[in-house]
Amino acid sequence: VPQEVMLFGGTISDNIASGNPAASKESIYEAAKKANALEFIESFPETFDTLVGERGVKLSGGQRQRIAIARAILKDPSILILDEATSSLDSESENLVQAALNELMKNRTTIIIAHRLSTIREVDCIYVLEDGEIVEKGSHDELALMEDGLYYNLLYNQLSNA
């Protein structure tokens, strides 16, 4: 799930189903529900048949992210890569997207690329990179206690700027 989601011209249903072209309408619906996308999809008069992309409805960043998450849920990958998946979202959208990501990450290996440390607090293991090298490794709680560590300093700076 990338930072900037690309939707192609077509329906919302088509965009979600690109994760699994053989998917049934029921599985597309369930994926949208798990991705916290159902409420906004059902607010459109044509619901899942609403056109998006260049000639269709303009979706917000959070809505596009949730379509991408629904697509990934439908694809059901064994390894998931999240590249700054919540970085450009407002707080309300971030909470909805984060809840959807938590659902998506269940029972699978997930690699998260993140600068916003609040998005990785609950992960099993954090690898901190500096100049392309791993400089720290541990849980959020472990790294947050290392006062001379890079993670600690990043966390401190983010919390003091919040």
PLM features per residue range, with description:
Residues 69, 113:
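Hydrophobic anchor residue at the start of the ABC signature
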Residues 103-112, 120:
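Conserved catalytic loops of ABC-family nucleotide-binding domains
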Residues 90-100:
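Conserved D-loop/post-Walker B switch-helix segment of ABC ATPase nucleotide-binding domains
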Residues 74-78, 107:
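A short, proline-enriched helix->beta-strand linker immediately N-terminal to the Walker B motif
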